[in-house]
């Protein structure tokens, strides 16, 4: 079967996807090892029998809703290719907004940055790649996530990052940071979106929090006060309807200069503040 023939068939079978053509192209790129430009320019290239079998198996899994990133084992974030697994969240484009806001507020001089609940290491590795002069500490309470983030750091040859197993601040007693960032669990366990799309295949522990999704956010806001240098920043990603509640939590905890930034879809996505000791 030719590349172009397989693409046509795959696109027709993936109409339930938000991006059937791109999904099909990614699977074809993954199995053949060819780039998109080659595939489109040489569409008459023949697939081997083995490639056809691999593609059919992947197509079935994608048709059943399994995330593309789980099928290929890789997701790009901040132009960094990251290994992913069902043990962690798949990095989302909107989380790059958190990285942008963090970079804009880091001091010019070298400093220490903490990423709580690092998962794949996406946020921490993006910051480390942009600020090689800074020391980044990334923590996660799940051993599989810690191993995956360490694998990503090693694969990308990023040296200015230390990845530890820690339940939020439990392994960080006495340490202080100029900035703390986190994309914590923030979805209400009753949210119907948990039964839709990619999140069905992701760990609930990385998605769901008590108190209508606010429990971990409030915990981080309160505990970060002891871990920030005076004037240090805390930046948190949250749900698009949680902006007001998160701002109030920052203010109640005594943070200053509290503001919420919008994501690429113009939704409130990242709230930040400064804490003065």
Curated annotation (Swiss-Prot):
Signal peptide: none
Keyword vocabulary terms for this entry: Methyltransferase, S-adenosyl-L-methionine, Transferase
A GO molecular-function annotation: protein-glutamine N-methyltransferase activity
HAMAP family in the record: RF_methyltr_PrmC
Top EC class for this record: transferase
Family designation: Belongs to the protein N5-glutamine methyltransferase family. PrmC subfamily.
GO biological process terms on file: peptidyl-glutamine methylation; protein methylation; regulation of gene expression; translational termination
Binding annotation for substrate: 183-186
Name of the molecule in the record: Release factor glutamine methyltransferase
Effect the entry attributes to changing residue 44 to A: 62% of wild-type RF1 methylation activity
Effect of residue 44 to R: 33% of wild-type RF1 methylation activity
NCBIfam families assigned: hemK_fam, RF_mod_PrmC
Species annotation: Escherichia coli (strain K12)
Gene: prmC
Catalysed reactions listed for this entry: L-glutaminyl-[peptide chain release factor] + S-adenosyl-L-methionine = N(5)-methyl-L-glutaminyl-[peptide chain release factor] + S-adenosyl-L-homocysteine + H(+)
Effect annotated for changing residue 42 to A: 40% of wild-type RF1 methylation activity
Subunit structure: Interacts with PrfA and PrfB.
Pfam families linked to this entry: MTS, PrmC_N
Impact reported for residue 183 to A: Less than 2% of wild-type RF1 methylation activity
Role of this protein: Methylates the class 1 translation termination release factors RF1/PrfA and RF2/PrfB on the glutamine residue of the universally conserved GGQ motif, i.e. on 'Gln-235' in RF1 and on 'Gln-252' in RF2.
